[in-house]
Amino acid sequence: MSILKSKKMIGALIVGIAFLSSTVAFSAESVKIGAMFISSGKMGGYGKHARQAIQLALDEINADGGILNRNVEAMVEDTELKKDVALNLARRFVEQDRVDFLMGPTSSGIAMALTEFARQNKKILVLTQAAADALTGSKFHPYVFSTLSNAMMHSRSGAYFMAAKPYKRYMCVGPDYSYGHSSWNMFKSKLEQLRPDVEVVGELFPKFLSKDYTEFINKVLAIRPDAVWCPLWGGDAVNFITQALPTGLFEKVKFVFPVAGALEVLVPMGRNMPSGVYVSSRYFFTSPDSSLNRRFVKDYYTRFNEYPDYMAGETYAGVYFIKAAVERAATTEADKLIAAAEKEPLAWETPEGWKVMNPVDHSVVEDCLWGETSYNQKYGFAIPGSFESIQGEEIGRTAEELKAVRMEYDKRAN
């Protein structure tokens, strides 16, 4: 039986001072979260949705008695997509604000620096947006927990999704940093395993936050692959799609976007989002049709006048992971919480369904959804439909890979 099916059997604007600006101090007895996301520039929507989700989650939790009868508070700051800014924020959170948990960031590149900071300071970092698989793989340490499906999981799910389709000649157009490369490498490796007949005909890695994609669009048109794996996200995905539309690229080549099912892409594209593009998103507000998700979407829309993006869904889930982990451990003390989380898998319910924290690599186990874009008159933008679910057991680390992660960590730790 699937773990994701069997786990169903496991049984004012702000309430109080639950959500704080950087000029307000935490109260002494609260459970404290220091969160960092990109909240400015063309990727700023990621931080905005994260902030709103944290507000909503904390209000719910505190209205229900908090965590261990303690109020929960958070500060949310802007990393500006800069490592030094993020590290300074983390240092302030730990040394001055005395937070119990760090949360974020958006960029995997910044997360690589923050995870080392968390290890050195023995402070738990909850990853809710950064997705490079190395964060719970080659860079694993016990103080990091990832509550969203990482690049490896999404890439493997994409390989399963595409393996049943007739395409043979593949190439990649992805951002030139850790996430883009790991996303492609994992997709390619799993697809070649499932479909030995596929052929890789090109790999293109434009600079992150590129403004002009003409060179890369022309190369795809010249090579004319059957399909393109394209892990561009946010404003980069919007710019690429917008610039490619006049060329008819999406009628000539099937594009597969592992994160373009995000509202950060679909809403600004509006009617211009091409139909028939394969997309995934770690959470999409129309699925699942559960009471929890319906309530979350309704409350979020009522409060913020917009639908929750995947950053909202995943960050909301991250806050509730902290609640579940603290309640199991009966403490916020990092080492005791880690020990409790590693005794057995920890399951908690979220708007996107049940999530399970793997006690070995601290990665979430969950299904991944894929769909195909089509314009929706009700919402005024394209949404994915005809969802296909790839089960979590198929896309997470194997028993051998999990063992290798801990063995490698033990070597580094000793």
Predicted segments with their positions:
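Bacterial N-terminal signal peptides that target proteins for export
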Residues: 2-13
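Bacterial N-terminal signal peptides
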Residues: 11-22
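Sec/Tat signal peptide C-region and signal peptidase I cleavage site
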Residues: 23-27
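Extracytoplasmic "Venus flytrap"
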Residues: 34-55, 77-84, 106-107, 173-181, ...
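Beta-alpha junction/loop-to-helix N-cap segments that form part of ligand/metal-binding clefts
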Residues: 45-52, 60, 64-137, 147, ...
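Extracellular/periplasmic Venus flytrap/periplasmic-binding protein
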Residues: 88, 133-134, 141-246, 286-295
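Periplasmic-binding protein-like
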Residues: 93-106, 126-128, 171-174, 224-234, ...
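Segments of small-molecule ligand-sensing domains
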Residues: 302-312, 323-394, 412
